Curated annotation (Swiss-Prot):
The keyword S-adenosyl-L-methionine does not apply. One of the primary rRNA binding proteins, it binds directly to 16S rRNA where it nucleates assembly of the head domain of the 30S subunit. Is located at the subunit interface close to the decoding center, probably blocks exit of the E-site tRNA. It comes from the Bacteria. GO terms for cellular component: small ribosomal subunit. PANTHER family: RIBOSOMAL PROTEIN S7. The keyword Ribonucleoprotein applies. This is Small ribosomal subunit protein uS7. The lineage of its organism: Bacteria, Bacillati, Actinomycetota, Actinomycetes, Kitasatosporales. GO terms for molecular function: rRNA binding; structural constituent of ribosome; tRNA binding. Part of the 30S ribosomal subunit. Contacts proteins S9 and S11. Transmembrane segments: none annotated.
Length: 156
């Protein structure tokens, strides 16, 4: 850890189209090689597709998807006397959101649809309905934490 202490958290700029910091965070996660306009086109296209498919506000669908993907527990490796234990710990709210966005974008990229816009839209739609690979990742993470509950006393 640096001597000055942790770096201060920078505020997330609110998205001009949907007036939501969540959309800005999603754009930042999609961003590759500094091509913000491309990332914005992908995200806004996916949001419009969500609006057409669901008939609801896409930000609400995004929030529902995020809630379904956010983990509440995860495991961290802890070395105790030559053995490495997977210790379950609670996930802080900021990290939960970051992990959820990371998983949504990662599993969107792994999907089979033709364009990234379609992939992201369908992954968000699946996640908001409690389906999809990103929700499965959360369930697997919780399962790992549950199966290693015996090592919870090694928390730090």
């Amino acid at each position: 850890m640096p001597r000055k202490g942790p770096a201060p958290k920078r505020p997330v700029i609110i998205d001009p189209v949907y007036s939501s910091p969540l959309v800005t965070s999603l754009i930042n996660k999609i961003l590759l090689d500094g091509k913000r306009s491309t990332a914005e086109r992908i995200v806004y296209g996916a949001m419009e597709g969500l609006r057409e498919k669901t008939g609801n506000d896409p930000v609400i669908t995004l929030k529902r998807a995020l809630e379904n993907v956010k983990p509440s527990l995860e495991v961290k490796s802890r070395r105790v006397g030559g053995a490495t234990y997977q210790v379950p710990i609670e996930v802080k709210p900021g990290r939960a959101s970051t992990l959820a966005l990371r998983w949504l974008v990662g599993y969107s990229r792994a999907r089979r649809e033709k364009t990234m816009t379609e992939r992201l839209m369908n992954e968000l739609l699946d996640a908001s309905n409690g389906l999809g690979a990103s929700v499965k990742k959360r369930e697997d993470t919780h399962k790992m934490a549950e199966s290693n509950k015996a090592f919870a006393h090694y928390r730090w």
